């Protein structure tokens, strides 16, 4: 068995090395990405009304996929969607019933669990926000289980379907010593992403016998409203426009197979991240 090659936890160093070695996979996703493979696929994207979710949906539309966008309140302001289902709060069981009802029996080829929440204020042990921590875990981790469970129990996920868990490198316990040295510590964010990673791994194990493949993905460092509190380090750490991040995610979706699933993938370079 070949040795696993992991991504570098030191993001400034990782980005510098990518430039030094002219890593096309990391620096020019267009050089490896074949979006035509997504043509005709029915894809459901949660949290598709802004940020990375919007960018992923737009990329899929450009590749002629049939995109179903869900959102909690404000509807997407772009065109080309196959369907929009609003009122989908991933923390609400009744919203899951509505989601299934509004899908009207439509089977899903690819489910992208993207809906998330990131508290703006930074957390330390001196100023924890317990309510916000629980909220982040409920949305980012339990929410992904709610959506996947609702679709699976309604038989809208089938053999050959793919489930993508959008999480974060922030959920890697192994990387905390490097990435959180000196803070910020952001307990809620990191706990919610670690929980999402665990949920994704368990889903991958449980759904594989049904022919449904699950992958856990860190989408890379993207310039969105959710990461704006880190904008001072965007450039040194290689943050990209969300449109580029979307292509990275879609490229990794194409690579999901019976031989490559249930992994924690850094969409930035295609390498694994340790749990």
Question: What are the language-model segments listed below?
Answer:
Residues 1-42, 274:
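Non-catalytic terminal and boundary segments that flank Rossmann-like NAD(P)-dependent oxidoreductase
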Residues 6-8, 18-24, 209, 216, ...:
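C-terminal helical subdomain
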Residues 49-59:
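N-terminal Rossmann NAD(P)H-binding glycine-rich loop of SDR-like oxidoreductase domains
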Residues 61-78:
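Conserved glycine-rich Rossmann-like NAD(P)H-binding loop of the short-chain dehydrogenase/reductase
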Residues 80-94:
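Rossmann-fold cofactor-recognition segment
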Residues 112, 164, 214-217, 227:
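Hydrophobic structural elements of the Rossmann-like NAD(P)H-binding subdomain
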Residues 117-137, 145, 159-209:
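Catalytic loop of short-chain dehydrogenase/reductase
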